[in-house]
Amino acid sequence: MSDFHHISVMAAEVIQYLAPRAGGIYVDGTLGGGGHARQILEASAPDGLLIGFDRDREAIAIAAERLAPYGERVRLVQRNFACLAETLDEMGIDAIDGFLLDVGVSSHQLDTAARGFSFQHDAPLDMRMDVSSGQSASDLVNTLSEADLARIIWDYGEERWAKRIAAFIVKRREESPIETTMQLVDVIKGAVPRGAWDVRLHPATRTFQALRIAVNDELASLEKALAAGVRFLKKGGRGVVISFHSLEDRIVKTSFRSFAQGCTCPKSIPRCVCGKLPLVKVITGKPVMANEAEVSMNPRSRSARLRAAEKI
């Protein structure tokens, strides 16, 4: 089990902006291999509490093994981070000092062929972060209407050839179900005109991203977790989010700005009647990006964007 690998992105920056301290209560909404969690525990020694979430039971198991030396300072939960509010309520915790969300798929999930996240390996077309529940990517591509497939591929993948890819998927599944990653890759390659292939981007990249987001309801989960995290933050507590593509980053940016906004009454009204007060101040004017040294060691960090906000 110890072969679970996931390189913690922007580790120093996470600690800088989260600013963990002794006695604090911190939530890591995306445990992965436990790298960020371990750093938070070290920075909040000797008595900081870490509550870790992950949908992936393999990630939970390896995190439990790796974080065992921290004993009762660690509580692990196999749940979507969208369940943050109800989980904290169940634990009797009414406020936290910080939360971290490192969203998207982990290096381990991408590199484990059997999980079906990658277009580089032939495997069952699954893509579920929690393999014990929900519909797989294969279920979606074989049952959704052409219009729904096109909408998902466009909305979640920002793929310009979404309609054509959806049409090719429907045509192909009429012959036999699309059950593996390479079967889907072949369909996509046939749908996207070769002259439109980007030398820097595999033609299946955006479609695979879109299906993964749809299978795991990632964007709605992110919005829900952000709202809950900000609500539970103590004054001075911080939320840190690392995203890897524009859809996620847009949600984080918009959410933090909304939480930082006060009165929304029209300017024509002389006195505020909405009663809305700012909840946070955004402490990253622009998204923080991985430095050149990190990108050279971990190319996947190139697309990482970190944003942070502090409760006021």
From Swiss-Prot:
Location of the protein in the cell: Cytoplasm
Catalytic activity as recorded in UniProt: cytidine(1402) in 16S rRNA + S-adenosyl-L-methionine = N(4)-methylcytidine(1402) in 16S rRNA + S-adenosyl-L-homocysteine + H(+)
GO CC annotation terms, alphabetical: cytoplasm
Domain of life from the UniProt record: Bacteria
Binding positions (S-adenosyl-L-methionine): 34-36, 54, 81, 102, 109
Keyword entries, A-Z: Cytoplasm, Methyltransferase, rRNA processing, S-adenosyl-L-methionine, Transferase
Function: Specifically methylates the N4 position of cytidine in position 1402 (C1402) of 16S rRNA.
Protein name from the UniProt record: Ribosomal RNA small subunit methyltransferase H
A family per Pfam: Methyltransf_5
InterPro entries: RsmH (IPR002903), SAM-dep_MeTrfase_MraW_recog (IPR023397), SAM-dependent_MTases_sf (IPR029063)
Record-level Gene Ontology MF annotations: rRNA (cytosine-N4-)-methyltransferase activity
UniProt enzyme class: transferase
Gene Ontology biological process terms from the UniProt entry: rRNA base methylation
Similarity remark: Belongs to the methyltransferase superfamily. RsmH family.
NCBIfam families named in the record: 16S rRNA (cytosine(1402)-N(4))-methyltransferase RsmH
Entry EC number(s): 2.1.1.199
